[in-house]
């Protein structure tokens, strides 16, 4: 908050310290709390991308509480053996990762061309995790 910074006569050299969340001192040596001269920023957005990967629970801590999780879903659960051999995931497995990670939204993509109807991926994933969207060509998403 520039008005408050001017009011406290904080040196320009200290702006970087304020941006880092640190307290500073004014020209008279008085300590100025960071919260007294700054405004709260907006919450950062988060997005994680897990593609060309087999079902791998150890990745969960790395995508914990993410807003938007893109996860490949190359196969359906009926073809889980093929998924295991080719080191890809099923829609259900992607949903399990999203659920365990407490993601807000799951975006599925990287579908095998063997499936003509892609809505089955969304339906399979929704048996585990409700907020599922298909990453279809040309679709954009806002985080």
List where the protein language model places each region.
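Active-site-proximal loop/helix segment associated with metal-binding centers of metalloenzymes
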Residues: 1-49, 53-61, 68
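Binuclear metal-ion centers of metallo-dependent hydrolases, dominated by the metallo-beta-lactamase
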Residues: 55-143
């Amino acid at each position: 908050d520039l008005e408050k910074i001017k009011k406290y006569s904080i040196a320009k050299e200290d702006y970087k310290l304020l941006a880092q969340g640190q307290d500073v001192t004014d020209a008279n040596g008085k300590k100025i709390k960071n919260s007294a001269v700054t405004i709260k920023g907006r919450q950062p957005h988060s997005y994680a991308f897990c593609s060309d990967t087999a079902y791998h629970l150890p990745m969960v801590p790395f995508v914990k509480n993410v807003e938007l999780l893109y996860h490949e879903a190359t196969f359906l659960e009926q073809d889980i053996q093929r998924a295991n051999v080719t080191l890809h995931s099923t829609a259900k497995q992607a949903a399990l990762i999203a659920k365990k990670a407490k993601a807000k939204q799951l975006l599925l993509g990287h579908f095998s061309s063997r499936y003509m109807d892609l809505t089955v991926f969304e339906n399979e994933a929704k048996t585990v995790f409700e907020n599922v969207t298909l990453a279809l060509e040309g679709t954009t998403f806002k985080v």
